[in-house]
Amino acid sequence: DVPSLELATQITEDQREYLIQIAYPSVNFGTDLPLLITALLGNDASTSAQAKLLDIEFSEEFARKFRGPQYGIKGIQNFAGINDRPILLNMIKPCTGLTPKEGARIFYETALGGADFIKDDELFGNPVYSKPEERVRAYREAAEAAYEKTGERVKYFVNITSGAGEIIDNVKRAEEAGADGLMINFAAMGYSVLKYVAEHTALPILGHSAGTGMCFEGTMNGMASPLAVGKLARLAGADIVMINTPYG
C-alpha cells in the first residue's frame, strides 16, 4: 500500500494509487530549500496532478551543505542534564495576554511541578505588552527561584517568531537577555528562515509545526508529515520539533 494518508478515515477502497520515484540534479537547488520545494511541489504537482510528496532522499553531497541540528539528541540530553529518562516539555497558558510578571508566576509553578523545558505558546510572540527579552529576564528569575526549592534548573525556550526582517533582532535581544533556547514556527516562517536563524545562533532551537496540517493532511497533494515536520525541519537546523498528533 502507498502510505499517502495521515488519517484512517481517509482510506478509499476504489482508488488506485502508484508510487513514483523521480530524480533531480541537486545542483539545480544549491542550498535553497524554497527552490527545492518549488521544484517538487510547484505548478501541476500542487494543483492538478493529484500527487503527494512522500519522502525526499538527499545525496550525501547535498546534505553536507546543511548544518542540520547543532545539538542533536545527545546534545539536547546534555543541555538538559538528563540522560536516563524522557525530557518533559510544558508551555505557558493562557496562550496570550500575559505580562512578563504574570507569565513568570505560571512559569515558577510549572517549574515546581517538574517540567524540564518550558516554552511559550506558539500564539505568544512579540506583543507590545510582553517583549521576548522581557519574558526571558522575568522567567529566568522564576527559574532561579524554583531551583532554590527543587535543585533542578528549568530551561526556557522563548518564541521569536515574527516578520522575517525582525527575526535576527529578536535572536540578538533574546541572547543578550540570557535565553536558554529559541522557538520558531517554521510552518509560518518557512524552512529557509529556520535555516538562517540556526546559522546565526549557538542556542538550541525548538521548531514549532503549527500550521503544517495544511501541508500534509490532504490526500491528493502536499507532502507526508514525517517530511514536513521531521526531515526538512531537521535539515534546516531544528534541534527539537513540536509535533502534534492528527487529533490535537
Regions found by a protein language model. Name each.
Residues 1-111:
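N-terminal capping/small domains of soluble enzymes
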Residues 69-79, 125-146, 166, 186-202, ...:
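Active-site-adjacent beta->alpha loops and helix N-cap segments on the catalytic face
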Residues 86-104, 154-166, 212-225:
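Active-site mouth loops of central-metabolism enzymes
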Residues 86-93, 118-120, 154-160, 182-184, ...:
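Hydrophobic faces of well-ordered beta-strands that scaffold small-molecule active sites
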Residues 90, 97-124, 130-132, 143, ...:
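Phosphate-binding glycine-rich loops and their immediate beta-loop-alpha structural context
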Residues 102-113, 135-147, 193-199, 226-235:
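Structured alpha-helical segments in the cores of large, soluble enzyme domains
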Residues 135, 139, 143-154, 158, ...:
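N-terminal active-site wall of soluble small-molecule enzyme domains
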Residues 169-171, 177, 181-248:
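Catalytic alpha/beta core domains of metabolic enzymes, predominantly
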